[in-house]
Regions:
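N-terminal charged helix/coil linker that caps or initiates catalytic domains
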Residues: 1-26
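Conserved N-terminal Rossmann-fold NAD(P)-binding element of oxidoreductases
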Residues: 27-29, 52
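Hydrophobic/small residue at the entry helix of a nucleotide-binding pocket
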Residues: 33-34
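Glycine-rich phosphate-binding loop and adjoining beta1-alpha1-beta2 segment
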Residues: 46, 51-88
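Acidic/polar active-site rim loop that often engages polyanionic ligands
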Residues: 59-67, 148-159
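Conserved SAM/SAH-binding loop
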Residues: 97-105
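Glycine-rich phosphate/adenylate-binding loop
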Residues: 109-112, 125-128, 135, 140, ...
Length: 240
């Protein structure tokens, strides 16, 4: 009789499958990147996933986010993702936290976890998560700027200090220096030069990002999410 993980076990072995079943991964940001990371880990035998995001599924998510369908509009992203994972991996424990990640979120690290995926697009929260993970000794992989790009083949995994062509990475490097954070930060990033989106979409917006939202395809965010999941997966199966 076929089992859900039998093809995976052929590749990694029974001992690795057992390690995956005992692992817990925190994913912050269930978006174009984080949604695909959660999907991949849910299908790869991870025993426990903690999903954090305060947003609801919106029409503008339909072109790229795995959780976005006409049936899920206006629903919590974390709850939609959790239901999706339970539909194909009922043994995976999925905990949902419908809130923005900030400095008050450190209680999350009061429980055992094996890895963190940072799929946050707000710089201050991104650095807060990176610092918290480092402080608690939990490895973290961060996704950098994936908007305004077309080519998923230009993604790579290095550390933050080796990035280029990425305005978000540049701003994060500056914040890291100001905070005196010296640890190497593993990141998934794109070598592709980003497209400049200068079309006013929401004149009533309060911020530049609201007025000029980033352009996005499915290709790059999805590939970034799968890359983050792959980094985590490989670390977990090798950790025994």
């Amino acid at each position: 009789m076929e089992t859900p993980l039998e093809r995976l076990e052929l590749l990694v072995g029974e001992a690795a499958i057992q390690r995956l079943k005992q692992a817990c991964v925190l994913i912050v940001g269930i978006c174009g990147v984080g949604g695909y990371a959660a999907e991949a880990l849910g299908r790869s035998g991870i025993g426990k996933l903690i999903l954090v995001d305060a947003d609801m599924v919106a029409p503008s998510n339909l072109n790229r986010q795995i959780i976005a369908t006409l049936d899920t509009l206006n629903q919590s992203k974390t709850e939609v993702m959790a239901a999706r994972i339970r539909s194909f991996a009922p043994d995976c424990e999925v905990i949902t936290i419908h809130e923005f990640f900030n400095e008050q979120s450190e209680s999350l690290f009061g429980q055992k976890m094996d890895y963190v995926i940072d799929a946050i697009d707000t710089l201050s929260s991104k650095l807060t998560l990176i610092e918290m993970a480092h402080r608690h000794g939990v490895p973290c992989i961060s996704s950098l700027g994936m908007a305004n790009r077309f080519d998923p083949t230009q993604l790579t995994v290095t550390t933050l200090d080796k990035t280029c062509n990425d305005p978000l990475a540049r701003a994060l490097r500056q914040m890291v220096r100001k905070r005196g954070f010296t640890a190497k930060i593993p990141v998934v990033w794109s070598k592709e030069l980003p497209y400049t989106q200068n079309r006013l979409i929401h004149a009533e917006g309060k911020t530049l990002k609201q007025k000029y939202p980033p352009a996005s395809t499915i290709f790059v965010p999805a590939a970034a999410g799968l890359s983050c999941a792959s980094v985590v997966f490989q670390a977990l199966i090798e950790n025994g």
